[in-house]
Amino acid sequence: MSSTSQKHKDFVAEPMGEKSVMALAGIGEVLGKRLEEKGFDKAYVVLGQFLVLRKDEELFREWLKDTCGANTKQQGDCYSCLREWCDSFL
């Protein structure tokens, strides 16, 4: 597995509170805007979808691709970020 980004490290270091969806690793401005347009404006809303999908990597990656057009790397970065956050805080 590749090393995690600073964005990933910053996100998983603390409770997410009201962080923007763009605070998630793998989600930049373009994907963030697409997610916001579909009602996923906060990181915790994406976390909710992640949990509804039972933290299943394949289902979450597919959902992210279908919802905002995330590529394979972006999908993996976002999944890993949420998985590690859940391991620390849930």
UniProtKB/Swiss-Prot annotation:
SMART domains: BAF. The modification Phosphothreonine is found at T4. InterPro entries: BAF, BAF_prot, BAF_sf. The modification Phosphoserine is found at S2, S3, S5. Its main location: nucleus. GO terms for cellular component: chromatin; condensed chromosome; cytoplasm; nuclear envelope; nucleus. It is found in: Nucleus; Chromosome; Nucleus envelope; Cytoplasm. GO terms for molecular function: DNA binding. Gene3D superfamilies: Barrier-to-autointegration factor, BAF. Keywords: Chromosome, Cytoplasm, DNA-binding, Nucleus, Phosphoprotein. The keyword Zinc does not apply. The keyword Cytoplasm applies. One of its GO terms (biological process) is response to oxidative stress. Non-specific DNA-binding protein that plays key roles in mitotic nuclear reassembly, chromatin organization, DNA damage response, gene expression and intrinsic immunity against foreign DNA. Contains two non-specific double-stranded DNA (dsDNA)-binding sites which promote DNA cross-bridging. Plays a key role in nuclear membrane reformation at the end of mitosis by driving formation of a single nucleus in a spindle-independent manner. Homodimer. Belongs to the BAF family. This is Barrier-to-autointegration factor. It comes from Danio rerio (Zebrafish). The lineage of its organism: Eukaryota, Metazoa, Chordata, Craniata, Vertebrata.
